A protein has these predicted regions:
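N-terminal metal-binding scaffold of metallo-dependent hydrolase/deaminase domains
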Residues: 1-52, 56-62, 66
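Metal-associated gating/positioning segment near the N- to mid-region
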Residues: 78-143
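Histidine/acidic residue-rich metal-binding segments in metalloenzymes
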Residues: 163-332
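A glycine-rich helix N-cap at a beta->alpha junction
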Residues: 142-156
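C-terminal cap of metal-dependent C-N hydrolases
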Residues: 347-350, 404-453
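Short, acidic/polar
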Residues: 102-109, 160-170
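His/Asp/Glu-enriched, well-ordered alpha-helical/loop segment
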Residues: 229-257, 304, 325-326, 330-332, ...
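Divalent metal-coordination and catalytic microenvironments
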Residues: 11, 31, 80, 91, ...
């Protein structure tokens, strides 16, 4: 829906710069927040003059048209709803090009909008992978056809082979948001160092999938109770910490903006904490599944709870929450990884790793982090919107006058049951669960791109 002026009244705004949410009304004009009116004291009502200005009519006529304006969607009554900056996810797989039977950019964007996301950063492990200008141009052009903002990382190495760096400078000029070979760990230390140095010069983040295959017998299942249950070797925490330790040292050496992707172990969290204390420009992602579940889910849910890195022990889950709480981990990212039902129905050692997450992320953040007292509302939104946008230089993550009107309106207590998905895929361990947090509207650039039916 395209409207030059949109009013949102009676909402509760979550602004990460504020200590607590506050009641206010918003006015949106031409894709930006033009006015915020705090409700301090007397209840604010959208004035007849304001509506008259919007409609080009006299005040009396505007008063008579108020109900009609509401019905047409020009005024949103957000009573009971929270208004936050549109969520931003910097670790997403839309499988396009190459694997569009799992997801494509259009269906992925629709799933993102339903989950409250207005900004997505795609990973580059498609087919062909995003190591060249043509594939990058394809992804960005298709992204512009959706209702949300879609950026994309490009590969660090050609063909994701870990041997030769891509033309990082040229790809940066063509619109790359950052660099990653996510899905494949980079084992050549000298190559990683050079990549960091070049990324720093380009002022772009470089992200790393930290699992050393030398330690791993079977991906996706933790070496512990879960691997014992399946009688397999599994994947130990050392696989992660080995590469995290190396890359944090290189981050200190090069000064690059380094992102440790989908952190899963208490040891890695502590390593990141120490590196930050030393002054490294390092960032870490936590996925909702890693701060919610443990390896017990892999035993109970099977391949629906198989992902890389795997779900770990309760001590690891609690360490991730502590890291989110004290700022060691500054990004919540879904690692949305769609797979077909046929693929996930394979035996645990053969099924691909990964779960979808865009439509459940906000609810899990509410239940696991806010309702349990680990994060305040502003802190949750900081990690799900403001911090990701800041790191990648994206517009968004703010609710203030003149800011882009990228917003999510949701009811924090209303519950919903995880069942059908907008995504093409349904590989989620949360199916059947009742979760808090229902998205009513997602607004991107002043346009309503999702509205609860």
């Amino acid at each position: 829906m395209e409207e030059s002026i949109l009013y949102i009244k009676n909402g509760t705004i979550i602004d990460p710069k504020e200590n607590r949410p506050y009641k206010a009304d918003l006015q949106i004009e031409n894709g930006r927040i033009s006015r915020i009116i705090r409700k301090e004291g007397e209840h604010f009502k959208i004035s007849a003059d304001a509506l008259a200005l919007a409609e080009g009519k006299d005040s009396l006529s505007a008063v008579r048209q108020d109900n009609a304006a509401l019905a047409e969607g020009k005024v949103i009554d957000a009573q009971g709803l929270m208004i936050a900056p549109g969520l931003a996810d910097t670790h997403v797989h839309f499988r396009d090009p190459g694997f569009t039977y799992k997801e494509d950019i259009y269906t992925g964007a629709a799933a993102a909008a339903k989950g409250g996301f207005t900004q997505i950063v795609l990973m580059a492990n498609t087919k062909p992978c995003v190591d060249n200008e043509d594939t990058l141009s394809y992804v960005l052009a298709k992204g512009k056809e959706t209702g949300i903002h879609i950026a994309s990382c490009v590969n660090v190495t050609k063909g994701m082979a870990g041997k030769e760096l891509t033309d990082m400078e040229r790809l940066s000029e063509r619109g790359a948001a950052g660099f990653t070979d996510d899905g494949i760990p980079l084992l050549n230390e000298e190559l990683v160092r050079e990549a960091m140095e070049r990324a720093k010069k380009l002022h772009k983040p470089i992200s790393f999938h930290e699992e050393n295959p030398a330690f791993i017998v079977n991906n996706g299942i933790n070496r512990g109770r879960a691997s014992a249950f399946y009688h397999i070797g599994g994947s130990p925490g050392e696989a992660e910490t080995d590469l995290v330790k190396r890359d944090l040292e290189l981050a200190l050496l090069t000064g690059a903006d380094v992102v440790i992707q989908h952190i899963s172990t208490k040891e890695a969290v502590e390593l990141v904490r120490r590196a930050k204390e030393k002054g490294a420009s390092v960032h870490a992602e936590a996925t909702p599944h890693h701060f919610t579940l443990t390896e017990e889910a892999a035993i109970e849910k099977g391949t629906l709870a198989k992902m890389n890195p795997p779900l770990r022990e309760e001590a690891d889950r609690l360490a991730i929450i502590k890291g989110l709480k004290d700022g060691t981990i500054d990004l919540i990212a879904t690692d949305h990884a769609p797979h077909s039902r046929e693929e996930k129905d394979r035996p645990v050692t053969e099924a691909p790793s990964g779960i979808i997450g865009l439509e459940t992320a906000l609810s899990l953040g509410i239940r696991e982090l806010v309702e349990k007292g680990h994060l305040t509302w502003p802190e949750l939104i900081e990690r799900m919107s403001t911090s990701p946008c800041r790191l990648y230089g994206l517009e968004g993550g703010r609710v203030e006058e003149k800011a882009a009107a990228d917003l999510v309106l949701f009811h924090p207590q209303e519950r919903w049951t995880v069942s059908e998905f907008t995504s093409k895929s349904s590989n989620s361990p949360f199916i059947g669960e009742s979760l808090p947090g229902v998205v009513y509207y997602t607004i991107c650039g002043g346009r309503i791109v999702y509205k609860k039916a």
